[in-house]
Amino acid sequence: MGILNLWRQFGRRYFWSHLLLGVVAASIGAPTILAGVTDNISQANTSPSQSWQNQALSAFDNLFSLQNVQHQPANGVNYWQQHAVRNVIRQLSFAFSISQPMSDETAKQSIRLSSSNIQQLVLETLNTLLIREPKPPEPVLDIPFLNVASQSSYILTLWIAKAQGIRAGPTAYL
């Protein structure tokens, strides 16, 4: 297999998907949200309790259901934007499901409440990005035109502006 084919496969499998993931993550501020999660991952205990695992799994059922929701194909959202958002949802599902079990119950409760609010906010934002329907711009049809040109003097730019709604061009005649 040639080096060009290997490079093409690497780009298709890894580079472009991670580039899109980074663009979406940077645009919604995920690096600042996940900063505390990565600290918790590095300090995570290797033997968490079974109840903690059950709580973590039940907390992210909503996340997996958001990822698997079928959307209307005609909603006007860019395919690559949907792909990147789904990748972000998938990555966040793993990042949010790993956190450090704590010994103090009050600290554990406060961190769980604050992180669950942030996680829910991020997931709702991503879901909104995924299923939103952008409204197309409405053309302005009723533009008053001054009839300064007579029938004998035909001006192409005024006709194009009047017929096709172009607003650029000479403003003295419009």
Swiss-Prot record:
A cellular component term, taken from the record's GO annotations: periplasmic space
Keyword Repeat on entry: no
Localization in the cell: Cytoplasm, Cytosol; Periplasm
Swiss-Prot/TrEMBL keywords: Cytoplasm, Periplasm, Signal
Pfam families (alphabetical): SecM
Single GO term (MF): translation regulator activity
Signal peptide: 1-35
Role summary: Regulates secA expression by translational coupling of the secM secA operon. Translational pausing at a specific Pro residue 5 residues before the end of the protein may allow disruption of a mRNA repressor helix that normally suppresses secA translation initiation.
Stated family: Belongs to the SecM family.
Name the record gives this protein: Secretion monitor
Annotated source species: Photorhabdus laumondii subsp. laumondii (strain DSM 15139 / CIP 105565 / TT01) (Photorhabdus luminescens subsp. laumondii)
Gene name linked to the record: secM
